[in-house]
């Protein structure tokens, strides 16, 4: 009974967290949820070999529904990924080969799996791939059975497409224009196969979702619903989920757990409590209490550490979180003895600036090559002023030449200038 109670309030709970951008027929959906568990889906197109932070809110939304007793379907678009969604994109997407897309499908399925429970009885999650129904469909079937239900007049008036059509330098190909039909049919297909009654997605998907609702009604005479989550923005107007190095990925080989943890630690005070509502499963009351505590403590806020810990654990597990915190602590304290070889690999991947050097190099040259100083002369002064450490140990001899003891695990040396400027030397 508790599950159903939570479920009937689910839309309200999501709204309290700021997680609802648009919803079709909210009262009817709330009533449907109150009657008992439903199946719902969210689609993830393989446009790269990993999901990124932008995918996390809808993915966690699937998890929220499952926790309330509903059955989530994670659809990876093996077919739609071959076409490319034009929604609010300034230019035509590059088409990827079928082999590449199928490889990416496998990786993304694996990435989605830990967030959902695929073995919990009646509301066990399902993984689906729309290539299963589009792969063998011929063009005549597509045009007759799907195309005849779509009005071109309505399609070109959808905001996502209209923006492209209004650009003089960019039109839209028939390939991308037809994407709306494919995603619409996904909904109708999942409704028939698994009784899916709700699609969730980012607010840029509204046009595709409403097409699917309309098509499902026409093909199966079933009422289904759509709900979108907001696209995440930052208070300062800059794009969320990007760093100087590009997107923040969920794949630890593309964004290390340390870098991922640091991304959240650096969240602005103006964003952090909102992000706790979006990206964690903490109660609203708990988040509000934390905000109040931070406001009155007179110290640096604790919220960023709570956020970083919660989201890193969600995405990278306890092991990833422990490593990220260990690296953070060691860099802060300057004592590197607790770092493992795997920790150094994370730092080399994207944690701190990295430079490769030949054995026999001296400290002055290392500071220049690492861009910690502009010239050997400047490097000499900095070293002499006791402002440089090698693996956490001060070194004030400008003529210092690195030796084997400086090469941790035979390969790594961490330089620091001042308090915060790091560079990792990887010896060739």
Curated annotation (Swiss-Prot):
Instruction: List each copy of the S4 RNA-binding domain by range.
Output: 361-418
EC numbers listed for it are: 6.1.1.1
Listed PROSITE patterns = AA_TRNA_LIGASE_I, S4
Q: Which SUPFAM superfamilies match?
A: Alpha-L RNA-binding motif, Nucleotidylyl transferase
Q: Where in the cell is it found?
A: Cytoplasm
What's a single GO BP term from this record?
A: tyrosyl-tRNA aminoacylation
Q: Where is this motif: 'HIGH' region?
A: 46-55
Q: Where does ATP bind?
A: 242
Q: Where is this motif: 'KMSKS' region?
A: 239-243
| Quaternary context | Homodimer.
Q: What does this protein do?
A: Catalyzes the attachment of tyrosine to tRNA(Tyr) in a two-step reaction: tyrosine is first activated by ATP to form Tyr-AMP and then transferred to the acceptor end of tRNA(Tyr).
- The name under which this protein is listed is Tyrosine--tRNA ligase
The protein's gene is named: tyrS
């Amino acid at each position: 009974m508790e599950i159903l109670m939570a479920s009937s309030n689910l839309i309200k709970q999501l709204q309290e967290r700021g997680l609802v951008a648009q919803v079709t027929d909210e009262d009817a959906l709330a009533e449907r949820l109150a009657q008992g568990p439903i199946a719902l889906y969210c689609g993830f197109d393989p446009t790269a070999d990993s999901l990124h932070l932008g995918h996390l809110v809808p993915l966690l939304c699937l998890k929220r529904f499952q926790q309330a007793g509903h059955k989530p379907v994670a659809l990876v678009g093996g077919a739609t990924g071959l076409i490319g969604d034009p929604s609010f994109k300034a230019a035509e997407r590059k088409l990827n080969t079928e082999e590449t897309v199928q490889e990416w499908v496998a990786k993304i399925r694996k990435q989605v799996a830990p967030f959902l429970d695929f073995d919990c009885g009646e509301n066990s999650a399902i993984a689906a791939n729309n290539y299963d129904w589009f792969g063998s469909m011929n063009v005549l079937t597509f045009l007759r059975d799907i195309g005849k239900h779509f009005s071109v007049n309505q399609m070109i008036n959808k905001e996502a497409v209209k923006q492209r059509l209004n650009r003089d330098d960019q039109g839209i190909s028939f390939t991308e224009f037809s994407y709306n039909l494919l995603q619409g049919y996904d909904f109708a297909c999942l409704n028939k196969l698994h009784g899916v009654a709700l699609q969730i997605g980012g607010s840029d998907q509204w046009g595709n979702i409403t097409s699917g609702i309309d098509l499902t009604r026409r093909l199966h005479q079933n009422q289904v619903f759509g709900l979108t989550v907001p696209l995440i923005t930052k208070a300062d107007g800059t794009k969320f989920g990007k760093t100087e190095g590009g997107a923040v990925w969920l794949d630890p080989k593309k964004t290390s757990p340390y870098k991922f943890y640091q991304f959240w630690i650096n969240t602005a005070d103006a964003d952090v409590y909102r992000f706790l509502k979006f990206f964690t499963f903490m109660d609203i009351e708990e988040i509000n209490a934390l905000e109040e505590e931070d406001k009155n403590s007179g110290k640096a806020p604790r919220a960023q550490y709570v956020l970083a810990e919660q989201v890193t654990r969600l995405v990278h597990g306890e092991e990833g979180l422990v490593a990220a915190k260990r690296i953070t602590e060691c860099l802060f304290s300057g004592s590197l003895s607790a770092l493992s070889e795997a920790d150094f690999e994370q730092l080399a991947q994207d944690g701190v600036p990295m430079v490769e050097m030949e054995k026999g190099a001296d400290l002055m040259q290392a500071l220049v090559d690492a861009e910690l100083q502009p010239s050997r002369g400047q490097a000499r002064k900095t070293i002499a002023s006791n402002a440089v450490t090698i693996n956490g140990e001060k070194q004030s001899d400008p003529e210092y030449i690195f030796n084997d003891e400086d090469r941790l695990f035979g390969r790594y040396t961490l330089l620091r200038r001042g308090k915060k400027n790091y560079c990792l030397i990887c010896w060739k």
